[in-house]
Amino acid sequence: MSEKKIPYKIYLEENEMPTQWYNVRADMKNKPAPLLNPATLKPMTAEELGHVFCDELVKQELDDTNPYIDIPQEIRDFYRMYRPSPLVRAYCLEKKLGTPAKIYYKFEGNNTSGSHKLNSAIAQAYYAKKQGLKGVTTETGAGQWGTALSMACAYFDLDCKVYMVKVSYEQKPFRREVMRTYGASVTPSPSETTEVGRKILAEHPGTTGSLGCAISEAVEAATTREGYRYVLGSVLNQVLLHQSVIGLETKAALEKYDITPDIIIGCAGGGSNLGGLISPFMGEKLCGEKDYQFIAVEPASCPSLTRGRYAYDFCDTGRVCPLAKMYTLGSGFIPSANHAGGLRYHGMSSTLSQLYDDGLMEARSVEQTSVFEAAEQFARIEGILPAPESSHAIRVAIDEALKCKETGEEKTIVFGLTGTGYFDMVAYEKFNNGEMTDYIPTDEELAVGFAGLPKVE
């Protein structure tokens, strides 16, 4: 098909939207290792997980055999409010870079939450409501997940308690107020409201928090209240399952114009966006149908894939959550206060960790000043102000496009633009004022985190 016929934005029709989520674990030869009970170090049973998570979500978490799972009609109806999202051809960026590469990005910022997080938030809220629960608790880093969940809970009339990483709580007051507007209560983490929060504050006075800290508090808040369950915005298998709508739509849009990507790039914190984007393409690679280059991009200040260890570790700082086998910096690792709050997590999805360990994708770490250079370049050329998290993928997409400029290769690059950065102006202000710095943890600092890894036979 002629390139001239490829529009700036490729939209699917509503009747072309996915009716099933794709479960990449079903096609994996080496399955992700099971979650372990922190007390017994034995695989978690559905009954044990049911004390923390909603029943139907537990089934999804443990399902590594069914490749497709039906999306309930109520969730599909909600998706129609903001999906399908566009796959955008970055013609202006290509021209500015002078590259023969073809660049596409899947834009997930066209909803009030400002990011892809709503795809899983509405699913988890639906199952909580269906179970007859009063409410849910959660953590949030930059605030996108908390915003998405507050929207979903408002839709299903559920109570929503959010523990927000303290550095983001302070940097992003407007994100906090959006959550409150949708009815959520928002607490900076670590806090004095939970036992684990008080313990972390005593051990790390003045800490700016981390996703691991906030998870611990949210889990405690859920398990000590009748009629509540904990929900998570990343890392877990169930979240990657719900986020597969991103990759399924991307794949369908590309196929409409007979486009085959060479490189697929996503930012990586806990893995929700990356897993959602690459899963359907990874399935083809696993089945030997096609080959793609997958690149996970993480902050150099929190490099779980590029410098972490593949081991069982606690998913939270307070060590109350199940243990997951993943690439980790240690649950006690507290990353520097970088401006990509959604990527400040010590570990990585077990599913993505297994795929990475099997050599099926690669990872790169980038420093935040170079990330914001790419973010501003993208904003000025493509007209979208990207979230700091998304900008990690932009950085590497530009790098790959410039490589094509040097070699003359006409590669097709697809990356995930997870959301907008309109609530991240403190970060942009720091960059514009020349006050932004890069921080890369030393080997000695990482060793402290590794020393705390649990001993699992």
Each model region followed by its residue ranges:
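Positively charged, low-complexity intrinsically disordered leader regions
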Residues: E3-L133
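Active-site/ligand-binding loops adjacent to catalytic centers
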Residues: Y68-D70, I200-Q238, I246, D258, ...
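Active-site nucleophile and cofactor-binding loops and adjacent substrate-binding regions
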Residues: F107-L118, V136-W145, L236-V239, I265-G270, ...
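A short, small-residue-rich loop immediately preceding and capping a beta-strand
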Residues: S120, A128-V167, T260-L274, F294-I295, ...
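Alpha-helix C-terminal capping segments
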Residues: A123-L133, T147-D159, R180-T181, I278-G288, ...
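Active-site-proximal loop->helix
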Residues: T137, W145-T208, S304-F314, M425-N433
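Claisen-condensing/thiolase-fold acyl-transfer catalytic domains that form or cleave C-C bonds
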Residues: A268-G276, Q368-G434
